[in-house]
Amino acid sequence: DTTTKWGAERAKNGHPAPFPLKYIEIGNEDFGPVYWERYEKIYQALSAKYPDLVYIANSVIRVVGRENDDKRKDIPNFVNPKNVKVFDEHYYNSIEWACEQHYRFDNYKRGVADLFIGELGINGKYPYNLLATGAIRMSIERNGDLNPLFAERPVMRHWDFLEHRIFLPMLINGVDSSVKTSFFYL
């Protein structure tokens, strides 16, 4: 509806029709008893109004060292684990770590929640970080029965917006242009 505030903003930016939203994540890098309770309350409220959306839960942020360290082992701690359909895992680590994780998802238990790698950042110099990212992505693709979703990070950095070693906008975007990074071709 372009008569609403955000519908008008969307139309002003060249998209009068609504986007076909399928997924929504509840939180970002939230976990623990308070999150598990709040997830259920938010899930119940949203799913009552928008039953066709798929809701994504967050995983604990912990250092992962072993291939069989399935972050989804915390799902039973949610108030109602059956309401956790997709589980978001974030990974930031070294090139060496990424290469060691090539078989990581082979040992994930099946029949739990679907897998979403919402953030993957491999530290290191190009092209080695690109190749190491490929090792993780091959593991994700090889385990397609986990119904994996994947989001690459970083998308683009605008180096003119670096202030006191803090990245401000992480994305360069516009309705009239796009830039494909080397990660796009991986």
Residue ranges, per PLM feature:
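N-terminal catalytic cores of secreted or lumenal carbohydrate-active enzymes
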Residues: D1-I75, P81-K85
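Catalytic-core region of carbohydrate-active enzymes that cleave or remodel glycosidic bonds
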Residues: Q44-A45, P51-Y55, P76-P81, K85-L186
